[in-house]
Amino acid sequence: MRKWTIPILFLLVGSVASFAQEAEESLEVDSSAVAKTVNKSSLAAKRADSKLNETLLHKSVLDYTLPPEIKTVVEKCVSGNIDECYFSLKTYENDPQKEVSSAANLELAILSLQRGLVSQAVTYIQQASSLNSEDPFIELTKGWILLSAGKYKQARQTFDHLLYLTADFEYVSSAKMGTALAWYFSGNKEEAAAAFQYVYTSNPYAISFVSYMLGKIASEMKPSRHLAPVFLQQSLSHDEKNYPAVALYAKLVEKEKDKRQAWQYYATLFSLDPQNKELAAKVEKYGESLGDKSIDYLFYLRLEQPIVHELESTPSESVRMALYANREQIPQQLKKVAFMSSGTARITDEKLGEVLRFPAYIVKTIEFNPQTKGVDFKNAKGQTEFSSVRPFRIQAEQSHKTLLVKDIHATSIFSADLSDKELKGTLIVVPTEDGFQLINDVYAEDLIPALLATKVQQITNESALEALAVVLRSALSQAVTEHAQDSYHITDNDEQFKFKGINLIFKTLLEASKESAKIRLTQTQAGSYDSCGVVAANAIENTGNKPAYVFSPANVSKYMLSNPPADLYARPQDPTQWASIKWIYLYPAKDIQSRIAYKQNIGKLKAITPTHFSPNGRILGMRFEGTKGTYQTTDPQEIMFILSAGSMRSNFFDIVPFYKGKTIEHVLVRGYDTGLGEGLCLQGANGLAKQGQDYVAIIKYYFPEARIIDTTTGTIN
């Protein structure tokens, strides 16, 4: 029997209906909601006269060609010599060849903005525009830089002028978005809503962001405030990772004095940013009314007994997986857990040997004893049957039986995903000074189907699942080798190895795992990510019609405008659900400052400078400059945490800072795809499988340089 509780992720629950009706399911209904908000607010906007067709939505006119001189210089940016790259470009700003000088000034404008040199950025982009006044991308960039500098009227005029240079969707849509933001930041919410309405009805790639902005505008205007939740629901239905939409929704339900929902949404935010004192205070304040039942309002799976019961084991390489790890991959100190076995089980102490046996489906409890710093093994009546300060093992006597770990208690209900989990193999209990940790020692082949289960929402085709199984098997083998001397090889919250229990597996996953065992990757860093555009970390893929993309700071911004090609392998089935491929978020600078302050107080944010890139421009390092200091990191995951509390989809993005005076007030992030862009793209694999490619062909496509071993014959390709 399963007990489902409220999700601790960005999905709005049915109880929100008391605040607003469920978000509309089609663009037609969505548009009527926009019109209603516009009318309620006396806004003068009209729906776009014509709907965009598929050809227009997937056509790209963007040209990534660079003059040879500039192409050579920007390679210094990739190598991490961002300052040398900047000053080398300056040698070409007055080059007699207009093609070279305009390109140099364009790159310098973008790099200057990243360095917080706003007035210089304006000067450079105006110089680029004067050198090449017919280039629509230069004109568009000019509008965005003026907007960043707070020159709202000039920005709107520039965006309007762009429409005389081009009618191409990629440029026009970005210009309309810039115009809407210029109206909003200048305080004219009616005009902003009207401009956002145009984008809302014409650009399916921006629905989530525009819905959020319409919700934000509605929340700030009394006549339409009651409609704000509808737009926020729509925003989250199109992109569940839109952190600002959740933050705004939390404030709205708080104003409505709905303590339960306020706790739920603040708990969602706090689970992502657990060092945030303001969020901690909100969670504590509204949690008081829920008492000990607060955990029941989180999305934790509860199982009364094992679901699988029996599953034949496949002897293979053993993997030690630490359970209940947090986002930093640290296994949490547990205080109490219950468990049962689907067959007779035994407890073995590392020194005493076998100390206890217990029958199937009998609940037992492991509880930390703060006096002894050990753990007590108790029966259903609370009587201690065994105590230990040393690690001990729990294992079903028959290898095809399973163990269920349930009702987990940790120091904080937000410390990790505390869902119940059914396991294969052995459960190792490790007492510590402050609790105990759990490690699952399991065969790799028994683990792989459960790892596949966490990805079935992304991929459903058998060939794609088989390809992912190959990647997982190879990655597990690498992890075992690399961490052979450690107490565990992986955690259950690793980005590559999300584990929610064997209770989620089904026949197709077992078959995919078995079939895929015929080959294995060697000498490659096997990995995967959920969804993809055409520019991966160091390759151009996922389409038959590959763009001539080359890296430069300007080309990254240009690519963020680009339409996905019609034949994109990762193309979603629902034409309104593009957020996993293209996304836009707007973050308050004060939130970014507060997360940096966990490590170092740099004061108010002055500049956000990418410092290291992958060959194609994914951000691998970033410098944050403030009024009191500078903080720098070369960890993409930390970058995404600082900017978005870890809710951003990938490290492939550009940034438009919006200044108020000399410091940044808001940060607009425009991004593509998910993850780090390395290895197997799950949605891309699904697309290739639909074209008839088998799992071997998919593996060869995404790992063209890998050595593939045939596990049956031992031959290597």
Predicted features and spans:
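Bacterial N-terminal signal peptides
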Residues: 7-15
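Conserved, single-site charged/polar hotspot
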Residues: 20-90, 98-100, 107, 112-114, ...
